[in-house]
From Swiss-Prot:
Gene Ontology cellular component terms for the protein in this record: BLOC-1 complex; transport vesicle
Protein family: Belongs to the BLOC1S5 family.
InterPro entries registered for this protein in UniProt: Bloc1s5
Function: Component of the BLOC-1 complex, a complex that is required for normal biogenesis of lysosome-related organelles (LRO). May play a role in intracellular vesicle trafficking.
Name of the protein: Biogenesis of lysosome-related organelles complex 1 subunit 5
Subunit structure: Component of the biogenesis of lysosome-related organelles complex 1 (BLOC-1).
Superkingdom classification of source: Eukaryota
Residues passing through the membrane, by range: none
Length: 158
Protein backbone atom coordinates (compact mmCIF):
# COMPACT_ATOMS: atom_id res chain seq x y z
CA UNK A 1 0.00 0.00 0.00
CA UNK A 2 0.98 3.33 -0.81
CA UNK A 3 1.17 6.01 1.94
CA UNK A 4 -1.06 8.17 -0.14
CA UNK A 5 -3.70 5.55 0.00
CA UNK A 6 -3.63 5.41 3.76
CA UNK A 7 -5.04 8.88 4.08
CA UNK A 8 -8.30 9.12 5.78
CA UNK A 9 -10.73 11.32 4.03
CA UNK A 10 -13.31 12.93 6.28
CA UNK A 11 -14.97 14.72 3.48
CA UNK A 12 -15.25 18.41 2.93
CA UNK A 13 -13.74 20.65 5.67
CA UNK A 14 -16.05 23.54 4.99
CA UNK A 15 -18.83 22.51 7.39
CA UNK A 16 -16.25 21.98 10.12
CA UNK A 17 -14.66 25.37 9.51
CA UNK A 18 -18.10 26.98 9.56
CA UNK A 19 -18.97 25.32 12.85
CA UNK A 20 -15.65 26.37 14.39
CA UNK A 21 -16.23 29.97 13.15
CA UNK A 22 -19.71 29.97 14.70
CA UNK A 23 -18.36 28.69 18.03
CA UNK A 24 -15.52 31.29 17.93
CA UNK A 25 -17.98 34.05 17.08
CA UNK A 26 -20.31 33.04 19.90
CA UNK A 27 -17.67 32.70 22.60
CA UNK A 28 -14.80 34.96 21.59
CA UNK A 29 -16.07 37.63 19.22
CA UNK A 30 -18.00 40.03 21.46
CA UNK A 31 -17.58 43.09 19.24
CA UNK A 32 -21.29 43.83 18.83
CA UNK A 33 -21.97 43.44 22.57
CA UNK A 34 -18.95 45.54 23.49
CA UNK A 35 -19.85 48.20 20.94
CA UNK A 36 -23.40 48.47 22.29
CA UNK A 37 -22.05 48.66 25.89
CA UNK A 38 -19.57 51.35 24.87
CA UNK A 39 -22.31 53.34 23.13
CA UNK A 40 -24.55 53.05 26.20
CA UNK A 41 -21.70 54.11 28.51
CA UNK A 42 -20.86 57.07 26.28
CA UNK A 43 -24.51 58.18 26.18
CA UNK A 44 -24.75 58.01 29.98
CA UNK A 45 -21.40 59.77 30.37
CA UNK A 46 -22.35 62.54 27.94
CA UNK A 47 -25.72 62.95 29.66
CA UNK A 48 -24.09 63.18 33.09
CA UNK A 49 -21.40 65.46 31.72
CA UNK A 50 -24.04 67.64 30.11
CA UNK A 51 -25.88 67.79 33.43
CA UNK A 52 -22.64 68.70 35.21
CA UNK A 53 -21.90 71.31 32.57
CA UNK A 54 -25.40 72.77 32.92
CA UNK A 55 -25.04 72.86 36.71
CA UNK A 56 -21.60 74.44 36.44
CA UNK A 57 -22.90 76.96 33.91
CA UNK A 58 -25.83 77.86 36.16
CA UNK A 59 -23.45 78.31 39.13
CA UNK A 60 -21.19 80.51 37.03
CA UNK A 61 -24.21 82.55 35.90
CA UNK A 62 -25.32 82.99 39.52
CA UNK A 63 -21.79 84.01 40.52
CA UNK A 64 -21.57 86.45 37.61
CA UNK A 65 -24.93 88.00 38.53
CA UNK A 66 -23.85 88.31 42.17
CA UNK A 67 -20.61 89.92 41.04
CA UNK A 68 -22.52 92.40 38.86
CA UNK A 69 -24.83 93.26 41.79
CA UNK A 70 -21.81 93.74 44.08
CA UNK A 71 -20.06 95.91 41.50
CA UNK A 72 -23.16 98.08 41.02
CA UNK A 73 -23.57 98.44 44.80
CA UNK A 74 -19.88 99.29 45.16
CA UNK A 75 -20.08 101.86 42.35
CA UNK A 76 -23.10 103.49 43.99
CA UNK A 77 -21.44 103.60 47.42
CA UNK A 78 -18.13 104.75 46.01
CA UNK A 79 -19.84 107.57 44.09
CA UNK A 80 -21.31 108.81 47.39
CA UNK A 81 -17.97 108.52 49.15
CA UNK A 82 -16.16 110.08 46.21
CA UNK A 83 -18.44 113.11 46.40
CA UNK A 84 -17.61 113.49 50.11
CA UNK A 85 -13.91 113.00 49.44
CA UNK A 86 -14.04 115.47 46.55
CA UNK A 87 -15.78 118.08 48.74
CA UNK A 88 -13.22 117.54 51.51
CA UNK A 89 -10.37 117.83 49.03
CA UNK A 90 -11.83 121.06 47.64
CA UNK A 91 -12.06 122.49 51.17
CA UNK A 92 -8.51 121.44 51.95
CA UNK A 93 -7.32 122.87 48.64
CA UNK A 94 -8.96 126.23 49.36
CA UNK A 95 -7.48 126.29 52.89
CA UNK A 96 -4.05 125.44 51.54
CA UNK A 97 -4.24 128.06 48.81
CA UNK A 98 -5.25 130.65 51.43
CA UNK A 99 -2.39 129.54 53.64
CA UNK A 100 0.05 129.71 50.72
CA UNK A 101 -1.13 133.23 49.90
CA UNK A 102 -0.72 134.27 53.55
CA UNK A 103 2.71 132.68 53.65
CA UNK A 104 3.77 134.51 50.49
CA UNK A 105 2.53 137.80 52.00
CA UNK A 106 4.47 137.11 55.20
CA UNK A 107 7.54 136.14 53.19
CA UNK A 108 7.30 139.37 51.24
CA UNK A 109 6.99 141.32 54.50
CA UNK A 110 10.02 139.51 55.93
CA UNK A 111 11.99 140.30 52.77
CA UNK A 112 10.96 143.96 52.97
CA UNK A 113 11.89 144.06 56.67
CA UNK A 114 15.28 142.51 55.88
CA UNK A 115 15.84 145.00 53.08
CA UNK A 116 14.84 147.94 55.32
CA UNK A 117 17.07 146.63 58.10
CA UNK A 118 19.95 146.27 55.65
CA UNK A 119 19.41 149.83 54.39
CA UNK A 120 19.24 151.12 57.97
CA UNK A 121 22.44 149.27 58.81
CA UNK A 122 24.10 150.81 55.74
CA UNK A 123 22.94 154.29 56.76
CA UNK A 124 24.08 153.67 60.35
CA UNK A 125 27.41 152.29 59.13
CA UNK A 126 27.88 155.33 56.88
CA UNK A 127 26.97 157.63 59.76
CA UNK A 128 29.45 155.83 62.06
CA UNK A 129 32.16 156.05 59.38
CA UNK A 130 31.42 159.74 58.85
CA UNK A 131 31.47 160.33 62.59
CA UNK A 132 34.72 158.34 62.87
CA UNK A 133 36.31 160.28 60.00
CA UNK A 134 35.11 163.57 61.47
CA UNK A 135 36.50 162.67 64.91
CA UNK A 136 39.71 161.47 63.29
CA UNK A 137 40.12 164.70 61.36
CA UNK A 138 39.28 166.70 64.48
CA UNK A 139 41.85 164.73 66.51
CA UNK A 140 44.45 165.23 63.77
CA UNK A 141 43.67 168.95 63.66
CA UNK A 142 43.93 169.17 67.46
CA UNK A 143 47.16 167.16 67.33
CA UNK A 144 48.59 169.36 64.59
CA UNK A 145 47.61 172.53 66.49
CA UNK A 146 49.10 171.30 69.75
CA UNK A 147 52.17 170.02 67.92
CA UNK A 148 52.53 173.42 66.30
CA UNK A 149 52.12 175.17 69.66
CA UNK A 150 54.69 172.86 71.23
CA UNK A 151 57.08 173.39 68.32
CA UNK A 152 56.72 177.09 68.63
CA UNK A 153 57.13 176.90 72.36
CA UNK A 154 60.20 174.68 72.31
CA UNK A 155 61.33 175.74 68.89
CA UNK A 156 61.72 172.24 67.54
CA UNK A 157 62.54 171.86 63.93
CA UNK A 158 61.35 168.83 62.19
Amino acid sequence: MNPKDKRVNFGSMEPLIRDIGTVYEFYFDQNTFIESEIKTFLKEFETKRGDRDLYSLSQQTINANNTIVNINRSIHQSSQFLENINNNLNQINSKLSTQVENESIHQEQRNNDRLNKFELELVEKKSIEDSFNQRKSQIENDFNEKASVLRDKYQIVL
